[in-house]
Every structure is written in structure tokens, then in C-alpha cells.
């Protein structure tokens, strides 16, 4: 009997959050280990479906780095990276687009639908959702000077046209976005999926942006999870070395989204089953929340 009471208490803990977020929009960046593990894939799909059933408009943006690497290797194409960004020539872009839109997107849509949801896949080219310009990287040379490097078809999102997402939401669908954008001349661009999620969240005036990662969240220098970070504290955390390496672009993505009107951003460990529900519907959460 006690176990049943505890289950009821868990449901009641979620009730105020369900009331608060019903009718609102949440954008989720889906990637990392959560995409590779069968149990985590099902957990993710069920979380997203539940959000939709209780009236939360859910938009998914997926990555696909490992799948791209595997396919490029199979084709004998060697990737070069500049400041963590893949140099993407025309041949590489063709493979990237094929993998993201033709393989990964269909897989994500498939396992949401197979578990009882109604997902619809698209890329940033559909409905001119993500308009891009070429992203140029600034690189320091050995003499200390700064050089601008052209890394090919890597895009910087300059415009988001969310009408197609809003139409899908009204139709009861869960939009699943592949991070491929389009230039003014119709050319395809590879875009960082975290950036896409942040830009889409801002365009939809989302209540939350959630980035699923392969770490527990932002940690202090002592290795303890920082469960909540005020937006104003982020620059100091980067300057003093608390936020380092690959976490910097993720945190920056969150702060950019908050500055553009998103209410809260979360960095959550996607290796935990039902991580999305635990972060949204419990009093403590499991990741790092960044709030304005």
C-alpha cells in the first residue's frame, strides 16, 4: 500500500507543473548517448508523447554526429575540424544532408510513432524554416593575429520562419527537425543542432529549451552539480574556468535563447531514463537550469 501512496504522491508533485506548462511550448535538443541506447530511445519517445498528451507543444531537434562520421568513413571521406566545427565541402554536405534528413530524422520520427505518438519529420529547408548564411570561423595564427577561415557549408541561422511548426502543432503533430538549413540561393547548410534548438525556441517564444547531453549538467570546480544558475552569473563562470570546453557553446546557446525571450533553459543528462520528465515535473530536477 505504501508504494501505491508514493506513486500517487509522485503524480501529485507533477500536477502544478502540468497546470503551468499546458498550452506552452518546449523545445528539446535530442542527441548523444540517448540516441544510441534502445532503452533510452524508448524512454525519450514516451516522455515526448506524454508531454503532447497533457497539452504541451513539443518540438524536437536532433543531432547525428556519430552517424555522419560512420557514413563519411564508409565513403572514404576524411573530416577536418576547425574549433570543433566540421569543415563541410560540397561532397561532405551531400552526405551530411543524406544522413540527417534521410536516416536519423526518419528513425527519430519512427520510434515516436511506433510508441503511440504522432511525429512529423522536416529539415530547416522545409517551409524556409531555417534561413542561413555561411558561418566564418575566426582562428588565431601562431603570430597572434586573427585569420578568418571558410569552413564550407556550415550555416549561421539568420532567420527562423516558424509557420510550418505552428501548423504541425495545431494538427496535433510533434515536429522533429533535422539541423540542415537553406541559404538565399537554395544551397544547403550544416548547422549545430544546439544552435538550431535555441533559435527555434526563441522564434516560438518557448517556455523551455532543454538540451539532452552526455553529462549531468554544469558542475562547479569541485565537481558538484549546479542545479540552478542565474543568467547574470554565466559570464563569470566562463571567465573563472568553471564552465569550460564543450560546455561553453551549450551554455552560450542557452543564454542566447534566454536573451531572445525563452523563459528557462536546461542542460540535462540524457543517459538517465525519463530525464525530460524528471527535469520538468519534479521539485528538484536532475540537471542544470539557467534562468533569466
UniProtKB/Swiss-Prot annotation:
Gene Ontology CC entries for this record: cytoplasm
A Pfam family matched in the record: AA_kinase
Residues noted as binding substrate in the record, renumbered to the chain: 64-65, 86, 190
Keyword Ribonucleoprotein assigned: no
Enzyme class: transferase
Molecular function GO labels: acetylglutamate kinase activity; ATP binding
Enzyme Commission identifier(s): 2.7.2.8
One GO term of the biological process aspect: L-arginine biosynthetic process
Catalytic activity from the UniProt record: N-acetyl-L-glutamate + ATP = N-acetyl-L-glutamyl 5-phosphate + ADP
InterPro entries the UniProt entry points to: AceGlu_kinase-like_sf (IPR036393), AcgluKinase_fam (IPR004662), ArgB (IPR037528), Asp/Glu/Uridylate_kinase (IPR001048), Glu/AcGlu_kinase (IPR001057), NAGK-C (IPR041727)
Keyword Kinase applies: yes
SUPFAM superfamilies, per the entry: Carbamate kinase-like
Cell compartment(s), UniProt: Cytoplasm
Superkingdom of origin organism: Bacteria
Record site: Transition state stabilizer: 29, 250
Involved pathway(s): Amino-acid biosynthesis; L-arginine biosynthesis; N(2)-acetyl-L-ornithine from L-glutamate: step 2/4
Keywords recorded for this protein, A-Z: Amino-acid biosynthesis, Arginine biosynthesis, ATP-binding, Cytoplasm, Kinase, Nucleotide-binding, Transferase
Alphabetical list of NCBIfam families matching this protein: argB (TIGR00761)
Family per record: Belongs to the acetylglutamate kinase family. ArgB subfamily.
Function: Catalyzes the ATP-dependent phosphorylation of N-acetyl-L-glutamate.
Name under which the protein is recorded: Acetylglutamate kinase
Organism: Citrifermentans bemidjiense (strain ATCC BAA-1014 / DSM 16622 / JCM 12645 / Bem) (Geobacter bemidjiensis)
Amino acid at each position: 500500500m505504501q508504494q501505491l501512496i508514493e506513486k500517487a504522491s509522485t503524480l501529485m508533485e507533477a500536477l502544478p507543473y502540468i497546470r503551468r506548462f499546458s498550452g506552452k511550448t518546449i523545445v528539446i535538443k535530442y542527441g548523444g548517448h540517448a540516441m544510441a541506447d534502445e532503452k533510452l530511445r524508448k524512454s525519450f519517445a514516451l516522455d515526448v508523447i506524454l508531454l503532447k498528451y497533457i497539452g504541451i507543444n513539443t518540438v524536437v531537434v536532433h543531432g547525428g554526429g556519430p552517424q555522419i562520421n560512420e557514413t563519411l568513413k564508409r565513403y572514404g571521406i576524411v573530416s577536418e575540424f576547425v574549433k570543433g566545427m566540421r569543415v563541410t565541402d560540397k561532397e561532405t554536405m551531400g552526405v551530411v544532408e543524406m544522413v540527417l534528413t534521410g536516416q536519423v530524422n526518419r528513425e527519430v520520427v519512427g520510434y515516436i510513432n511506433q510508441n503511440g505518438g504522432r511525429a512529423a519529420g522536416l529539415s530547416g529547408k522545409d517551409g524556409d524554416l531555417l534561413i542561413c548564411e555561411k558561418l566564418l570561423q575566426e582562428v588565431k595564427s601562431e603570430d597572434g593575429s586573427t585569420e578568418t577561415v571558410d569552413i564550407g557549408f556550415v550555416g549561421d541561422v539568420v532567420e527562423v520562419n516558424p509557420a510550418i511548426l505552428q501548423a504541425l502543432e495545431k494538427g496535433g503533430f510533434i515536429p522533429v527537425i533535422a539541423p540542415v538549413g537553406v541559404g538565399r540561393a537554395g544551397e544547403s547548410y550544416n548547422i549545430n543542432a544546439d544552435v538550431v534548438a535555441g533559435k527555434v525556441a526563441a522564434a516560438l517564444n518557448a517556455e523551455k529549451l532543454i538540451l539532452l547531453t552526455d553529462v549531468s549538467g554544469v558542475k562547479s570546480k569541485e565537481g558538484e552539480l549546479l542545479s540552478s544558475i542565474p543568467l547574470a552569473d554565466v559570464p563569470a563562470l566562463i571567465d573563472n574556468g568553471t564552465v569550460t570546453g564543450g560546455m561553453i557553446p551549450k551554455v552560450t546557446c542557452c543564454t542566447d535563447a534566454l536573451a531572445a525571450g525563452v523563459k528557462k533553459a536546461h542542460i540535462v543528462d540524457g543517459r538517465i531514463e525519463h530525464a525530460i520528465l524528471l527535469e520538468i515535473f519534479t521539485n528538484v530536477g536532475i540537471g542544470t537550469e539557467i534562468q533569466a
